[in-house]
Structures are given as structure tokens and as C-alpha cells.
Amino acid sequence: MKLAVIGGDGIGPEVTAEALKVLNAVRDDIETTDYDLGARRYLKNGELLTDEDLASLREHDAILLGAIGAPGSVPPGILERGLLLKMRFALDHHVNLRPSKLYDGVESPLRNPGKIDFVVVREGTEGAYTGNGGAIRVGTAHEIANETSVNTRYGAERVIRYAFELAQSRRKKLTLVHKTNVLVHGGGLWQRTVDEVAKEYPEVAVDYNHIDAATIYLITDPSRFDVIVTDNLFGDILTDEAGAVSGGIGLAASGNIDATGTNPSMFEPVHGSAPDIAGQGIADPTAAILSAAMLLRHLGDEDNAVRIETAIAADVAGRDNSQPISTTEVGDRIVKALQS
């Protein structure tokens, strides 16, 4: 397995090291290439992501990312647009996959959360984040600005098919989230596509929620969901809420996936670079390790993905949450569990 590793900034390299430790405990064929991408490189020479970087990344089977960001040193938006979004579009990461699971031993902010175990499939390369917009008369009382949400049948269908395949392998329920009563053109495209693709998956139950209703149900009845499929903007909102109800983003992993396999997909923890605790050895690497499990599953290694997830579930359930986290100790415990 040829693995591109982007440790990134802050705690990113620390948690990524533990994810690699766990990967090497279950596989002996991993060949890694480290990439200096993120705030450190940008502050040093102004580079974000070059064509040479992209060409080199494409030579790998997958990408493991730690975290990107340097609040206070790099203005907001520069790394997001110039590195993360550029990589997403260049490598056609059209599926953003975000599992949400409440583990035993983890406290949800919800009083009676029930069983939380669902996945959000978010479209990643269209919608309101394509940069299709503009502004005139900026800074005046007559300023006009617009952002156009771009939706194509091709883009929506490939994500919807991915979601149906996922639902078929899980509890066989798919929920489309949109705002079709107001966004009649883009929403209509998504609804029609779901209705048509659903005919090929008769065993999958399909329902629909408006985005406002879905945000409520994630709080009041999260166990109703199995697989949620939605567009880029609504998915951005739902995935962060999903992380919150399942105990916080410290346990949230994600995948940015080219479902065709043409380009390497990227897997990362959802949390940020947390520069305030970087270098102290107290960052929780669990989300990074879960990202590594997602990476293995994407590459067809289901057995080892399940082994890692099982070890994590047992470790999380047995933690003394009154004691501080040790980054390396968490990785060591997971490795020990895998080797026992």
C-alpha cells in the first residue's frame, strides 16, 4: 500500500503518528511518503499546493491527513481554499463520508440519545462551494453579492448511488435531506434522482427531510437515521451537528472520496490543528485512528478495519475520563489490543 501522509499543523503530526502506528500493527506492506503541506510551508515560502504536489499525490493509493491550520498566523480562508478545497476539486473527492457513532463510555450532550449510528454522505464538489458568484459595488450601501449553487445530474447521481450502496450494506434506510419546497430547481434535481435510483434498490427504504427538520431530528431522534445523503452546504451543517451529538469532534473521522478510484481518496480526523495543545502529548488520536480504519475499508481491507474499530470501541469504553489523555498511550493501547 502506497500511502501519502500529510501531518499538517499543530497536533496533526502527533495524531497521524499514532494512526500510522496502528496501521503498521495490522499491515506489513505500507510504504509512506511524507508531504510538507500546510501553514508551516505557506509561512516559509508562500506555497500551498503545487501541480507537482498533486502529481505526486496521485501516485499513491490513499492519503492520510492530520490537521491543517494556524489561527493567528494565517488569515482564515487561505489554507481552506488554496490547499484543502483545491485538493478536493483536483482529486475529484466528490463524496464526503462522515460516520456518526456514540460509543459506550462517551457522554452525549443529549439527555436520552438512544443508539446513534448513522453516516452522512455529503456531495463534495458542487453546490454552493464551487466559487460561482461575485460582488459589485463592494463596500457601498448598494453592494450586491451572489453565490450560485451548482447542481448537475451527473454530480448528484454518483453521490446518491454511493449512498444507496452504503445503505444496502447497513440497515437499509436512506434519507435525502434538502429544501425542495424552496430550492425547487436544485432540490428537484436531487429528489428526482433519488426517486429514480431507488428503483434499483428495492430493499432500501427511502424517506425525505427538509434541512431544518433534519437538524431537529438529529437532536430529538438521532436513532431514526442510517444513511443521510445531501448536498455540499447542507452536508457541511449536518456533519458538524452529527459530530456534536455523538460526543464531540474528538471522535469524528471523515473520508474525502473519489468513488471511481481514479484518484487517491483522503482520510482525516474532523478536529482542527489545536495549536494551544500542540507538542504537549495530550491530543486524543482516536479520530485519526478511526480515519485509518476508514482508509482500510475504502481500499477493501474490511477485516482489519473492523479489528481497529473494535479495539477502539473497547478502549473508549474502558477509559477513565477523569484522567488526561496521553497521545502515545492511546496508540500503544490500541496496538496492544490488536496484537493480543
From Swiss-Prot:
Key words of the record: Amino-acid biosynthesis, Branched-chain amino acid biosynthesis, Cytoplasm, Leucine biosynthesis, Magnesium, Manganese, Metal-binding, NAD, Oxidoreductase
Amino-acid positions noted as binding Mg(2+) in the UniProt annotation, renumbered to this chain: D212, D236, D240
Superkingdom, natural source: Bacteria
InterPro entries: ICDH/IPMDH, IsoCit/isopropylmalate_DH_CS, IsoPropMal-DH-like_dom, LeuB_actb
Gene Ontology BP annotations: L-leucine biosynthetic process
Residues reported in the UniProt entry to bind NAD(+): G272, S273, A274, P275, D276, I277, A278, G279, Q280, G281, I282, A283, D284
Pathway: Amino-acid biosynthesis; L-leucine biosynthesis; L-leucine from 3-methyl-2-oxobutanoate: step 3/4
Primary location class: cytoplasm
Cofactor(s) for this UniProt protein: Mg(2+); Mn(2+)
Cofactor binding mode and count: Binds 1 Mg(2+) or Mn(2+) ion per subunit.
Record field: catalytic activity: (2R,3S)-3-isopropylmalate + NAD(+) = 4-methyl-2-oxopentanoate + CO2 + NADH
EC number(s) reported in the record: 1.1.1.85
Enzyme class, UniProt record, top EC level: oxidoreductase
Record function comment: Catalyzes the oxidation of 3-carboxy-2-hydroxy-4-methylpentanoate (3-isopropylmalate) to 3-carboxy-4-methyl-2-oxopentanoate. The product decarboxylates to 4-methyl-2 oxopentanoate.
Subunit structure: Homodimer.
Identification of the protein by name: 3-isopropylmalate dehydrogenase
Originating organism: Corynebacterium glutamicum (strain R)
Lineage of origin: Bacteria, Bacillati, Actinomycetota, Actinomycetes, Mycobacteriales
